[in-house]
Amino acid sequence: MAADHTHVRPWRMITRRQSRKIRVGSVEVGGDAPISVQSMTNTLTSDAAATLEQIRQLEEAGADIVRVSCPDVESTAAFKTIAREAKVPLVADIHFHYKRGIEAAQAGAACLRINPGNIGSPDRVRDVIQAARDHGCSMRIGVNAGSLERELLEKYGEPCPDAMVESALNHARILQDHDFHEFKISVKASDPFMTVAAYYQLAEAIDCPLHLGVTEAGATRTGTVKSAIGIGAMLWAGIGDTIRVSLAADPVEEIKVGFDILKSLGLRHRGVNIIACPSCARQGFNVIKTVEALEERLAHISTPMSLSIIGCVVNGPGEALMTDIGFTGGGAGAGMVYMAGKPDHKQSNEGMIDHIVDLVEKKAAEIQAAKAQDEAAQTVAAE
């Protein structure tokens, strides 16, 4: 099998915090499990067909877990159909009405997300815990800076990391007092500084898995930057077991950005990682249009691979050394194609995109075939 060129190491190896492992349906979260990527639907949950269509789009993008809001009885009624047909585990998002949590557990939710700031009294939380236990659901204690309990706001004067962590730990104790330990916690704010400070403090205080995110981060550009800074800082420190990038955009973009963050830190790889120069007067072809076309044409590839698209020979050969496939612009309307870091053949700029797509698809098929062969050999050896 060809050498793995997908991993670009950070300056130091990341040592992940040792958290307790739980399950969200078929997906393990925490411990040594891969860091999962999730998103949330923005359709009306009562419209089961529309919600399922969006879930399928998220599944195709690589989502491990999908959260679905359950604000009313109509939503939890539709949830049963949605959960039955979805391929990924679903988290039911519960606010204000604890009975929606009980209904969602009965309808097939893999996890219940509750907000301590608005779920109600400990007795109501107890009833939700019992429903989760009865139906094999895990739970997420989801604390948001914008919806903290009144007494904590009075105590601290304003939303702050200390208040968020205290809220989370108070509700963790309620779950633990009822001998329920299949839970994870999030402490999110729209300010990356507040978010990171809260998670750092929480990571020292409890061993449960942590769901990372910067809430209400903004539209695609600003939200991506905030999330990359906040989530990236925590992951680099080894904190975090599952992530959700919150964007005011198509939920599929959240999955793409989430995987890009993990790929940038060498924590998880999915699809083609395209390395491209910003282009300048030396470019031998239109780098920007080429990369845009390749991103669209290669979106269906889930096999981890790396591809460098560099406009000239200043950095092109060096970048190609570190990628599975590379293309470097040259003169006379042609460039050099690199395979596994070595010059392989020349290719004219005309037809270059089709040629690169063909090379990537063939390489992905080779990698998958070799992987299947290795797995078959391991199965035989284990028998």
UniProtKB/Swiss-Prot annotation:
Residues engaged in binding [4Fe-4S] cluster: C277, C280, C312, E319
Entry's Gene Ontology molecular function annotations: 4 iron, 4 sulfur cluster binding; 4-hydroxy-3-methylbut-2-en-1-yl diphosphate synthase activity (ferredoxin); 4-hydroxy-3-methylbut-2-enyl-diphosphate synthase activity (flavodoxin); iron ion binding
GO biological process terms on file: isopentenyl diphosphate biosynthetic process, methylerythritol 4-phosphate pathway; terpenoid biosynthetic process
EC number: 1.17.7.3
Catalyzed reactions per annotation: (2E)-4-hydroxy-3-methylbut-2-enyl diphosphate + oxidized [flavodoxin] + H2O + 2 H(+) = 2-C-methyl-D-erythritol 2,4-cyclic diphosphate + reduced [flavodoxin]
Superkingdom, natural source: Bacteria
Protein name per UniProt: 4-hydroxy-3-methylbut-2-en-1-yl diphosphate synthase (flavodoxin)
Entry's cofactor comment: Binds 1 [4Fe-4S] cluster.
Function: Converts 2C-methyl-D-erythritol 2,4-cyclodiphosphate (ME-2,4cPP) into 1-hydroxy-2-methyl-2-(E)-butenyl 4-diphosphate.
Matching PANTHER family: 4-HYDROXY-3-METHYLBUT-2-EN-1-YL DIPHOSPHATE SYNTHASE, 4-HYDROXY-3-METHYLBUT-2-EN-1-YL DIPHOSPHATE SYNTHASE (FERREDOXIN), CHLOROPLASTIC
Needed co-factor(s): [4Fe-4S] cluster
Family: Belongs to the IspG family.
Pathway: Isoprenoid biosynthesis; isopentenyl diphosphate biosynthesis via DXP pathway; isopentenyl diphosphate from 1-deoxy-D-xylulose 5-phosphate: step 5/6
Alphabetized UniProt keyword annotations: 4Fe-4S, Iron, Iron-sulfur, Isoprene biosynthesis, Metal-binding, Oxidoreductase
